[in-house]
Amino acid sequence: MKNYFLFTFLFFGSSIWATNSSKTMMSSVKNRFVRTAAGPTGKVSIVIDKSDYELSVYDNLGWYATYPVVFGNNSLGDKKMQGDKNTPEGHFTIIAKRVHPKWCRFISLNYPNEESREKFAQRKRRGEIPSNASIGGGIGIHGTWPHDDYLIDRYNNWTEGCISMKNEDVIDLYRYVTNGTEVTIHK
């Protein structure tokens, strides 16, 4: 009987410890990291890494902050046409910012730009997409529905091609990005 209790304690105790340990490790990846609360210094730029699910901010001193993000399609492929739910890759700029009734804040990117139009035309010429396909638009960085930040924690890609952040993170980013801020998106 003693062996049974010892086995039960060791088995369940180690399971609980392993579960709690992995949650701690995962949560550190899902939180934002900021160099200083004072805000960025000088010109700001953004680099979004689709493979790592990260949006990083750089200023005149170098790295400033990294935020967890999610995208559209789980394939993480480059946007080919409207409706494919992929997030475009390339070099963009912020063209507008607004408070959004559904997604907290919306930071608009200049998609499609010349670079994305050229990739779209090449794909049409090669027959990779239908000849009547549209390039799409309305791509930006935004928050989630109220109380849906867990989508970011779970790396649940849910957008139509935009970049989604936790609401508190998009509010933070919104404070210091301006029209003309450069945004690079890559895999």
Cite the ranges covered by each PLM segment.
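Sec-dependent N-terminal signal peptides
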Residues: Y4-F12
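Short polar/acidic secondary-structure junctions
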Residues: N60-L61, K97-V99
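Short Gly/aromatic-enriched secondary-structure transition segments
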Residues: G62-N74
